[in-house]
């Protein structure tokens, strides 16, 4: 079967030799290749006839579109006999413009490969004028000859008419058969595989015509095939202006009565087709019923739907409809419910190389339904299809556990496996109200009309079964295993804050709800026992917990604090007067803290390592602050000491506010700012000195640890050096700006 469009160019004797007489001229078919790469058949005139013409058997069908005007070209159709009922072709011919009114006799045949072979052609004079177009046809030895009349034309432009393979004149008018203008596949058309059960009843009758039905009148789920649905498709609307409207006649229907049923066809010629429009690809397809062909004209504006369409068009029609298409296998007789809604757009349905047109307004293809907040709600909708038994989806829905929705923002949901023997994939589920669950629905044609109802579940998004097809297409993700479908959702909140009112259970089966409640209750009890028995854990358990924490936070190295001693010349400066007064009390407090730390267990030391890393960074910043204090005391930068406020920690600033609360007198804004910054410098130096006094004890404590002492990283040192240089440059620039401000102030 082929859908290639073959164009035949007819060159008359006038074009070849300049003679005005073309009577008795025969044509020879020469296959060529056009400029666009398509195969063409060129007819060249020959001087003599190669044989006698077969007499014409009158079987006229009158067309009243010309109304006696002999200068109007007509759209005609010739019929060819095909050797196989599953193959046909369509040919596009230009309208001939001879000098005289001529009757052309064309006799053609088509072999199984789909290539046109014109066996004999001839011309004869016809007495003008004519008032009607006559059509004749006869079948002799699997050959059909079609006679049509073409009036002369004085127009210079080239007109075209399309010669289609006729189709059936029987009662085949339905929503699945194309009629009217051709179809266009837009660029945004979607090609997706769907099951045949949600499709309209007429389409199911075509697809599921040979599928065996049970005694109850329903089709088993194991017999439901998969089809490919292309949507949307648009009808081509051609606007005809006044100049060309009188050229084309009204639609003419040609029918034959002497053709056997396996090749009897019917074609409607569409009125208003513009001659300059792009030729329409006529793709021939056959329905499931043998001997009933149908033409589906398609003009694609997108390469992807066109390629997919042509791929299924080229497939040969199989005798058994279920062969070559994987079916959905089930093992039980449980029922599931579906909802079908009217289709909004036209669509093409492809199944085993066959094409059906699905008109909009018919019922089928389940849509997304707005879910309710209740546990389940019944929504009855009328549908022309009956529910089919699908045990697989029902079994999956029973095994999938509902997620726990917690309204508090502080709660965090995470998934864990139900047991060691049934692992489940880890997934973080967000408790959003807008998330819904889409469940597949299965239904088939039935003479009874029932009201459908479904249970609407508001859960997190879960993808259910998606069968994979042998053609390379699949409906979505792979089908998950049964063990992975069982998920245990456990929240990481405290056991004391979780109550049954904050958890909403939504599922179809009460047994599943009870199972989920028992799992959550067990988890709460475990957390409660763990909370009240923390003091009884051994060092081994603490070491295990430490290893887990380090793994969670990505800590791969041991944390160390490197301390250096403060220079001696700083102790003689005026900035350490307050430190000398508070040195004894601060040192006592530090000793108390160190003794308490020493009494702590081994696990407490290890848990405090992240905090010690923060102390290391804090102390390095304080060292930089002490360097700047030296520069300030030396007189290099007095006015720019405000920079220290951004370096000191927040806790030091808070303590500084407490220390300076005794100040009752206030100077102007500038003097107050300098005073505060000066005291902040003193506080920073105080913290640095306290750390330096404790350096010996810290070094001793860390050497007693089981981990070796490692120097600070090189990258940190380089980074700190760069920061120090940048701050130095900033201080110099600010000093220069301050000098400029002073000069400007003096000038004013």
Swiss-Prot record:
Numbered residues of crosslink Glycyl lysine isopeptide (Lys-Gly) (interchain with G-Cter in SUMO2): 436, 583, 680
Q: Show where the record puts the motif Nuclear localization signal.
A: 604-607, 618-621
The reply to whether Transport figures as a keyword in the UniProt entry is no
Self-association state and partner proteins as the record states? Interacts with RARA. Interacts with SMCHD1; leading to recruitment to inactivated chromosome X in females. Interacts (via PxVxL motif) with HP1 (CBX1/HP1-beta, CBX3/HP1-gamma and CBX5/HP1-alpha).
- Spell out which residues are annotated as carrying Phosphoserine: 391, 419, 578
Q: Where is this region: Disordered?
A: 416-436
Q: Where does the UniProt annotation locate this protein?
A: Chromosome; Nucleus matrix
Which is a Pfam family this sequence falls into?
A: LRIF1
On the tree of life, the source organism's domain of life is Eukaryota
Q: What protein name is recorded for this chain? A: Ligand-dependent nuclear receptor-interacting factor 1
Motif PxVxL motif location, chain numbering: 559-563
Q: What does this protein do?
A: Together with SMCHD1, involved in chromosome X inactivation in females by promoting the compaction of heterochromatin. Also able to repress the ligand-induced transcriptional activity of retinoic acid receptor alpha (RARA), possibly through direct recruitment of histone deacetylases.
């Amino acid at each position: 079967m082929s859908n290639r469009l073959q164009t035949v160019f007819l060159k008359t004797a006038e074009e070849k030799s300049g003679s005005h007489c073309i009577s008795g001229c025969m044509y020879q078919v020469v296959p060529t290749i056009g400029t666009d790469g398509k195969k063409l058949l060129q007819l060249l005139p020959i001087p003599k006839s190669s044989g006698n013409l077969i007499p014409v058997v009158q079987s006229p069908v009158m067309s009243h579109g010309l109304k006696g005007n002999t200068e109007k070209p007509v759209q005609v159709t010739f019929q060819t006999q095909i050797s196989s009922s599953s193959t046909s072709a369509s040919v596009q011919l230009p309208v001939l413009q001879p000098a005289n009114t001529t009757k052309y006799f064309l006799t053609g045949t088509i072999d199984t490969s789909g290539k046109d072979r014109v066996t004999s052609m001839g011309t004869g004079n016809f007495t003008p004028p004519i008032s009607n177009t006559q059509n004749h046809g006869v079948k002799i030895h699997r050959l059909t000859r079609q006679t049509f009349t073409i009036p002369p034309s004085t127009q210079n432009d080239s007109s075209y008419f399309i010669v289609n393979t006729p189709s059936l004149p029987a009662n085949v008018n339905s929503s699945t058969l194309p009629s009217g203008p051709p179809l266009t596949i837009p660029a945004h058309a979607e090609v997706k595989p769907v099951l045949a059960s949600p499709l309209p009843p007429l389409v199911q009758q075509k697809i599921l015509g040979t599928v065996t039905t049970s005694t109850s009148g329903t089709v088993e789920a194991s017999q439901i095939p998969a089809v490919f649905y292309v949507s949307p498709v648009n009808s081509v609307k051609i606007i005809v202006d006044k100049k060309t409207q009188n050229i084309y006649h009204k639609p003419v229907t040609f029918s034959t009565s002497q053709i056997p049923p396996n090749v009897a066809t019917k074609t409607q010629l569409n009125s208003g087709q513009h001659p300059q429009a792009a030729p329409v690809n006529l793709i021939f397809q056959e329905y499931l019923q043998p001997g009933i062909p149908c033409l589906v004209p398609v003009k694609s504006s997108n390469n992807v739907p066109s390629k997919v369409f042509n791929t299924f068009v080229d497939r040969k029609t199989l005798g058994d409809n279920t062969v070559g298409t994987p079916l959905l296998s089930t093992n039980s007789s449980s029922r599931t419910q579906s909802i079908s809604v009217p289709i909004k757009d036209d669509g093409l349905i492809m199944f085993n190389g066959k094409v059906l047109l699905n008109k909009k307004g018919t019922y089928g293809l389940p849509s997304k339904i707005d879910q309710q907040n209740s546990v389940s709600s019944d929504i009855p909708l009328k549908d022309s299809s009956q529910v089919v038994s699908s045990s697989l989806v029902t079994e999956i829905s029973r095994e999938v556990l509902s997620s726990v929705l917690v309204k508090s923002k502080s709660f965090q949901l995470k998934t864990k496996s139900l047991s060691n023997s049934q692992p489940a994939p880890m997934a973080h589920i967000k408790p959003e109200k807008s998330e819904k669950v889409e469940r597949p629905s299965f239904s088939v044609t039935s003479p009874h009309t029932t009201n459908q109802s479904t249970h609407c579940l508001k859960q997190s998004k879960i993808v259910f079964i998606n069968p994979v097809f042998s053609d390379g297409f699949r409906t979505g993700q792979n089908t998950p295993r049964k063990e992975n479908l069982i998920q245990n959702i456990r929240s990481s909140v405290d056991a004391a804050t979780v109550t049954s009112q904050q958890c909403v259970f939504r599922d179809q089966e009460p047994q599943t709800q009870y199972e989920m409640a028992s799992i959550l209750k067990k988890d709460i009890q475990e957390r409660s026992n763990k909370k009240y028995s923390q003091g009884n854990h051994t060092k081994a358990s603490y070491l295990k917990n430490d290893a887990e924490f380090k793994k969670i936070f990505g800590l791969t190295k041991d944390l160390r604090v490197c301390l250096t001693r403060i220079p001696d010349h700083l102790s003689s400066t005026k900035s350490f007067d307050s430190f000398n007064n508070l040195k004894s009390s601060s040192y006592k407090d530090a000793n108390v803290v160190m003794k308490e730390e020493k009494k702590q267990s081994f696990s407490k030391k290890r848990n405090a390592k992240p905090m010690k890393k923060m102390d290391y960074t804090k102390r390095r910043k304080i060292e930089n602050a002490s360097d700047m204090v030296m520069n300030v005391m030396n007189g290099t930068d007095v006015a720019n000491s405000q920079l220290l406020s951004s370096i000191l920690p927040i806790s030091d600033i808070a303590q500084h506010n407490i220390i300076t609360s005794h100040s009752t007198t206030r100077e102007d804004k500038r003097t107050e700012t300098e005073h505060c910054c000066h005291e902040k410098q003193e506080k920073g130096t105080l913290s640095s000195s306290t750390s330096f006094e404790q350096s010996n004890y810290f070094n001793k404590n860390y050497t007693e640890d089981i981990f070796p002492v490692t120097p600070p990283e090189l990258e940190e040192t380089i980074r700190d050096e760069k920061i120090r240089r940048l701050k130095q440059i900033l201080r110099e620039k600010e000093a220069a700006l301050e000098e400029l401000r002073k000069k400007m102030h003096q000038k004013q």
